UniProtKB/Swiss-Prot annotation:
This is Pre-mRNA-splicing factor 18. One of its GO terms (biological process) is generation of catalytic spliceosome for second transesterification step. Its main location: nucleus. The modification N-acetylmethionine is found at M1. The keyword Nucleus applies. It comes from the Eukaryota. Participates in the second step of pre-mRNA splicing. Keywords: Acetylation, mRNA processing, mRNA splicing, Nucleus, Spliceosome. Belongs to the PRP18 family. One of its GO terms (cellular component) is nuclear speck. The keyword Protease does not apply.
Amino acid sequence: MDVLKSEILRKRQLVEDRNLLVENKKYFKRSELAKKEEEAYFERCGYKIQPKDEDQKPLTSSNPVLELELAEEKLPMTLSRQEVIRRLRERGEPIRLFGETDYDAFQRLRKIEILTPEVNKGLRNDLKAALDKIDQQYLNELVGGQEPGEEDTQNDLKVHEENTTIEELEALGESLGKGDDHKDMDIITKFLKFLLGVWAKELNAREDYVKRSVQGKLNSATQKQTESYLRPLFRKLRKRNLPADIKESITDIIKFMLQREYVKANDAYLQMAIGNAPWPIGVTMVGIHARTGREKIFSKHVAHVLNDETQRKYIQGLKRLMTICQKHFPTDPSKCVEYNAL
């Protein structure tokens, strides 16, 4: 009994020493006792407890909206109104809200750029990019000036000099599709670059005022775009890793183009781009024998234009070069295709 009384007295004395009970209060929280014991332990060990600063700045929020709202200082308007309008239109945002000033629109653009970065940059119109490059070349020419008597070739398109003629290429075309894949790829590369050079020379021969017109810039941009579309194809031809089905179709197209059989070349192009093999419905393999519809599903008969974006682009570039070839090397009307694309 004495032990129990002594323990009660000890705990009561501990509560009084810790100052846990205030006036008119008969209870305390266990967390307060634990906090007092922790402070006493730190004092015995010699640690100094730093008081918490109530006016301490809040931690940086992970939410960009809160960060922008906390930073209310007036930032200078670093963009012109025209640039703000252009960036807002690129993102599909209104250029001005009701009652909004130019500075408010700039602040709204700043918030949009922080919250929603450009995720569709790769899906922009590459023809527009080519046109912008042409315009920038003309601006550089105006800023840099031109010496009197100097020939204006600064903004001419790049010409692929293959040091060959159409007659030599037609002679090489006789050996296309004879089983030598490496030779076929070399002939395809040489002929396509030859057509790109012919197209570039035609555009470079225009008058200066024609080059600077809207249609002239569009034609130059189309040539640049086609050249960029065909780069992956040239890379595959150079590395000898062009898929066999596409290589076979392109070989037929080039062979017919060199023979000036443009209708047949167009048919081969459609065969490669669209295909004519309907996919069979239902079970195609039962047991060890294939059903009738299965026999028609070969890679040669299946469309390639929708396989991926890279294939679609160089197939489209090939179609443009077919138009250029027919334009510069005509034949009988019965063997020509009516093109209105270029």
